[in-house]
């Protein structure tokens, strides 16, 4: 970026995260060095905007939420998706999806599932855990056995191909994101594309993306709170209502809208010299 700017090129960065999920040496120095080479920013959540302003107060920035991830194909009929995955279509499936990393709170969801089992609320239900372990596989296995819920899970702890993404989200009745912290999540945008209601924790940008009581529920990063919202979703029969709302709310997450936001930012910095404030 710095070399490009010497030739008069203005630079724009799309910010997913400013501060890494897992801290490493020199993070702040490297982040400051990179941000110093950029003329404008497109950020995808207010949490990222707040983090950006820790490093630069005045450079232009515009908000544009992550568009729906629509590259996995169209939703499949639920029965077809279940058959392809070897799942019983008579059951209800709650799903945790994505890389299994400590900050994503899978342990909280497993504890919540254990609570629901003890309360006798898992009849006809399974929890799908789909994704590769980033770390701690043995620890999660021990937790699952201690809770006595192995028979209540569908474990797909492996790389998930693009084709299986469509099948999983077409089979799922509810996606849960029990994150301890986050900026935003691509999982949310996949759920929007496949019209799947969500339970998310109100951390980072997740609260901005999932209107509480409209397309899902927003709760605390706490096992009992997560269990309560999962139970509420099924007990109150919210699936049809939330799916209908998703079709309306997801219009905020189009690629055309993001392109427009990039263009508006470009118009603000066009005609300036690289590094010049406007």
Language-model features, listed with the residues they occupy:
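Acidic donor-binding loop of glycosyltransferase active sites
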Residues: 167-183, 196
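Nucleotide-activated donor-binding/catalytic signature segment of Leloir-type glycosyltransferases, i.e.
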Residues: 140-163
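A short helix/loop element that forms part of the nucleotide-sugar donor recognition site in Leloir-type
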Residues: 73-87
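Conserved donor-binding/catalytic core segment of Leloir-type glycosyltransferases
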Residues: 87-104, 110-113, 128
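Conserved acidic donor-binding segment of nucleotide-sugar-dependent glycosyltransferases
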Residues: 212-224, 232-238
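Short hydrophobic beta-strand element within catalytic cores of glycosyltransferases
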Residues: 174, 191, 197-200, 210
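Glycosyltransferase donor-sugar binding loop
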Residues: 126-139, 158
């Amino acid at each position: 970026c710095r070399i490009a700017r010497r030739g008069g090129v203005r630079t724009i960065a799309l910010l997913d995260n400013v501060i890494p999920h897992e801290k490493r040496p020199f993070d702040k120095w490297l982040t400051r060095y990179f941000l110093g080479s950029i003329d404008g920013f497109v950020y995808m959540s207010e949490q990222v905007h707040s983090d950006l302003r820790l490093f630069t107060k005045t450079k232009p920035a515009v908000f544009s939420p992550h568009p729906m991830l629509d590259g996995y194909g169209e939703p499949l009929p639920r029965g077809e998706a279940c058959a392809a995955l070897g799942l019983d279509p008579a059951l209800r499936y709650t799903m945790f999806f994505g890389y299994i990393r400590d900050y994503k709170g899978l342990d909280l969801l497993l504890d919540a599932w254990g609570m629901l089992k003890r309360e006798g609320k898992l009849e006809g239900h399974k929890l799908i855990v789909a994704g590769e372990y980033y770390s701690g596989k043995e620890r999660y296995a021990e937790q699952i056995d201690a809770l006595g819920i192995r028979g209540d899970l569908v474990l797909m702890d492996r790389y998930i191909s693009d084709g299986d993404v469509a099948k999983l989200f077409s089979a799922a009745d509810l996606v849960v994101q029990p994150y301890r912290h986050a900026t935003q999540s691509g999982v949310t945008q996949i759920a929007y594309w496949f019209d799947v209601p969500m339970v998310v924790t109100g951390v980072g940008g997740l609260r901005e993306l999932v209107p509480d009581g409209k397309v899902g529920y927003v709760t605390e990063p706490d096992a009992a709170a997560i269990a309560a919202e999962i139970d509420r979703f099924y007990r109150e029969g919210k699936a049809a209502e939330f799916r209908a709302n998703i079709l309306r709310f997801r219009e905020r997450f189009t690629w055309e809208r993001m392109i427009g936001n990039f263009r508006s930012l470009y118009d603000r910095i066009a005609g300036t010299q690289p590094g010049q404030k406007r």
